[in-house]
């Protein structure tokens, strides 16, 4: 159980949670299949295991792992448009009259309702870790929309959820640009070989570099010309590597082999034990990594009144 992406949210108040109350709350918002006329459903599922008895909350030390599933019927717009055009053409030809917007919209709704039961279903899951002792919720996603879907559903389940995206005092682009310009990152962080450079003008250019020496003259010339680093690949303390963007999204997380081998050793031969060990080790690593990252980026910004 290793997260591949990371969006970090700060709890703005103490969250009094225990496994039983969280399990009960999530049960009120459990995932279910789409009914024949439903476009989408969203709810919580067991992060580990299957079946109705699998718990919706996995607890390890003082960390809670949860998972949400979105189920949606895929109805391509082109299919609806083609069916609507065919119906409109048929009415206009048979009844010798024009079909106007109000009737056209009604026909479209009828077509959607007819096609929905036969539409393909797509399912996707999003994992999150709640760490009350750290005051954080960590979502395994690079999409703010997916993270907000999970958090808003969790808020509905709990009744309230005092949380906000974590922010830092210094603009991330300024720090990342400085690291590439000076060829040195702060603390135990090391610049790797990938970055994205953007012009400061609204319609300015974008340069994406992969497997490239970021200390090269070419990169430095872009920085001298005023481009800013908006995405940068980094390594931390020989434990993990990742790509950080200007919104503080951590992408393409990769945990080093030593950590994964340790989790395999701790988990034993049982599949659930392996998942639990990897989740625990991941969260203990995050407990060190995230404070170090935000300190290196200038320190966490605490909004006034919070």
Curated annotation (Swiss-Prot):
Location(s) in or outside the cell? Cytoplasm, Nucleoid
GO MF, one annotated term: double-stranded DNA binding
GO BP field:
DNA recombination; regulation of DNA recombination
Q: Does the keyword Magnesium apply?
A: no
InterPro entries given for it?
A: RdgC
Q: Does the keyword Cytoplasm apply?
A: yes
Keywords from UniProt, A to Z, are: Cytoplasm, DNA recombination
Q: Name one Pfam family in it.
A: RdgC
- What are the record's GO terms for cellular component? bacterial nucleoid; cytoplasm
Which family does this protein fall into? Answer: Belongs to the RdgC family.
**What exactly does this protein do?**
May be involved in recombination.
Can you say what this protein is called? Recombination-associated protein RdgC
């Amino acid at each position: 159980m290793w997260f591949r992406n990371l969006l970090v949210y700060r709890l703005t108040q103490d969250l009094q949670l225990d496994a039983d109350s969280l399990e009960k709350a999530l049960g009120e918002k459990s995932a279910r299949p789409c009914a024949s006329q439903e476009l989408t459903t969203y709810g919580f599922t067991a992060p580990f295991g299957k079946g109705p008895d699998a718990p919706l909350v996995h607890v390890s030390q003082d960390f809670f792992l949860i998972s949400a599933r979105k189920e949606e019927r895929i109805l391509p717009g082109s299919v609806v448009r083609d069916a609507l055009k065919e119906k409109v053409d048929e009415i206009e030809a048979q009844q010798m009259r024009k079909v106007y917007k109000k009737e056209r919209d009604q026909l479209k709704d009828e077509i959607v309702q007819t096609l929905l039961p036969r539409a393909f279903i797509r399912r996707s899951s999003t994992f999150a870790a709640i760490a009350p002792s750290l005051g954080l919720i960590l979502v395994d996603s690079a999409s703010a929309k997916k993270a907000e879907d999970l958090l808003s559903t969790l808020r509905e389940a709990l009744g309230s959820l005092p949380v906000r995206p974590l922010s830092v005092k210094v603009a991330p682009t300024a720090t990342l640009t400085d690291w590439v310009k000076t060829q040195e990152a702060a603390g135990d962080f090391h610049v790797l070989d990938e970055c994205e450079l953007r012009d400061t003008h609204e319609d300015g250019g974008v340069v994406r570099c992969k497997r490239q020496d970021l200390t090269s003259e070419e990169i430095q010339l872009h920085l001298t010309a005023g481009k800013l680093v908006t995405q940068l690949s980094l390594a931390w303390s020989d434990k993990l590597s990742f790509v950080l963007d200007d919104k503080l999204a951590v992408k393409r997380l990769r945990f080093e082999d030593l950590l994964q081998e340790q989790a395999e050793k701790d988990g034993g031969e049982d599949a659930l034990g392996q998942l639990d060990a990897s989740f625990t080790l991941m969260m203990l690593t995050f407990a060190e990594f995230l404070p170090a990252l935000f300190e290196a980026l200038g320190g966490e910004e605490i909004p006034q009144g919070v």
